[in-house]
C-alpha cells in the first residue's frame, strides 16, 4: 500500500543552544533514517516544500501497522504533527469506474 505522509509544525527555537540541540539530536538523525528508508524503497518520493517546516513523502508499507512502526522510529515523530492518507492505486480506481459504468448501463 502507498501512503501520502505529511509532517509539519514542530518546536520553535528560543535560543541558538536549543536549536543546536534539536538539530543534532532530533532533526539530523531523523533525516538519516528518512534517507535510509528511501534507499530501502520504503519512501518512494518526497521532499521539503521550499520555505516550509514541512516534510512530504510517499511511503510504501504492507499495512497500516508497518507504516505506523516506521514513523514511530523517526526521532522527530513526537515533535511533529503527522497526517497520513492511504492512497488508492490508479488500477484499483479504474476497476471501480468500469464497474460503475457497467452498472449505469444496466440501469439505462
Show the residue positions of the predicted features:
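Conserved, structured core segments of small domains
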Residues: 1-108
